[in-house]
């Protein structure tokens, strides 16, 4: 409960104004006369936001921004008084993104998430329709627009084969960034593509931990598919997955899709889910129960984050598998 948070209590006692993030950011943009480039989507928004920040920095264009992951080329947030644009990872959780009317909106992908906020897929889609309608220029994949009952006015002419980034989802979202930035910079499409082909990535988004070991924050069906597609694209041998679900509530939502997500992997280890904001009335889906749900004919095993799992991972890596 935010009302009982000690920092809020202290601020109120000291007469210090406080607000939600979106209210604060709107006030900041208004006072500093900055235009927002908002990146929204069920999946891919962190990486896509970072791509836009990376490109503007490489072009030596002043930029202010806020992104939800650690960057190798800057802090998670930065304010430059000389910047014209504020690049923002616009999260749909708690309908946060509906507080903004961006100059440019980039939609990295629309699926379905956050059933605790959006009880139905229709309510989730309606939020994206509303966000798009209150944005000035929108760059999105036609299939995502069709999914929410909208249509694209123009189709990208940026050739996806020009990108050397790993992962088809990253190449598709790089297209959107190039299209968007080409409208507000003097750079050619060719130069923007070259810059994005050198994009170093962000933490926890198919981040290389060591040789043949990667970490990814994929926790919805499309995010998991995207991560596995990248893994299968770069793996020399087999792909092994250690799966830690995010929220027991979300596991109930994706449980029936688990078997379809695991096609082509050699071994699946399922560890206990990370718990937060849970519906206590729902059955706890333990690793054993999730292993039973995963019907795909893949070798699967319940596990915990211990030395035994570490030993198994080491054996897979030594065998040339990608984990």
Predicted regions and their residues:
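C-terminal helical cap/extension that packs against the catalytic core
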Residues: 151, 258-319
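Structural motif
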Residues: 21, 104, 238-240, 267, ...
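Short internal beta-strands
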Residues: 138-143, 240-244, 264-275
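Active-site regions of enzymes building and remodeling cell-envelope glycoconjugates
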Residues: 15-17, 102-106, 147-166, 213, ...
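Nucleotide phosphate-binding/pyrophosphate-handling subdomain across enzymes
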Residues: 163-267
């Amino acid at each position: 409960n935010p009302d009982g948070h000690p920092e809020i209590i202290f601020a109120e006692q000291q007469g210090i104004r406080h607000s939600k993030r979106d209210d604060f950011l709107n006030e900041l943009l208004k006072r500093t006369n900055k235009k927002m480039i908002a990146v929204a989507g069920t999946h891919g928004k962190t990486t896509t936001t970072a791509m836009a920040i990376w490109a503007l920095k490489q072009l030596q264009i002043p930029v202010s921004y806020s992104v939800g992951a650690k960057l190798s080329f800057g802090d998670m947030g930065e304010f430059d008084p000389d910047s014209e644009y504020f690049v923002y990872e616009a999260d749909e959780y708690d309908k946060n993104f509906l507080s903004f009317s961006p100059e440019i909106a980039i939609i990295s992908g629309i699926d379905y998430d956050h059933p605790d906020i959006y009880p139905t897929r229709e309510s989730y889609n309606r939020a994206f329709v509303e966000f798009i309608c209150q944005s000035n220029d929108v760059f999105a994949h036609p299939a995502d627009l069709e999914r929410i009952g909208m249509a694209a006015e123009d189709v990208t002419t940026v050739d996806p084969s020009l990108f050397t980034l790993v992962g088809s989802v990253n190449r598709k979202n790089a297209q959107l960034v190039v299209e968007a930035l080409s409208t507000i910079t003097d750079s050619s499409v060719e130069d923007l593509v070259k810059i994005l082909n050198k994009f170093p990535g962000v933490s926890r988004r198919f981040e290389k931990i060591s040789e043949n070991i990667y970490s990814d924050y994929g926790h919805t069906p499309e995010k998991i598919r995207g991560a596995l597609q990248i893994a299968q694209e770069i793996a020399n041998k087999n792909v092994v997955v250690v799966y830690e679900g995010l929220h027991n509530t979300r596991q109930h939502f994706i449980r029936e899709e688990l078997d379809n997500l695991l096609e082509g992997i050699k071994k699946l280890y399922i560890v206990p889910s990370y718990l937060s904001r849970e519906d206590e009335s729902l059955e706890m889906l333990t690793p054993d129960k999730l292993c039973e749900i995963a019907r795909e004919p893949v070798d699967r095993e319940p596990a915990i984050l211990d030395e035994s799992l570490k030993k198994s991972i080491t054996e897979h890596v030594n065998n040339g598998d990608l984990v």
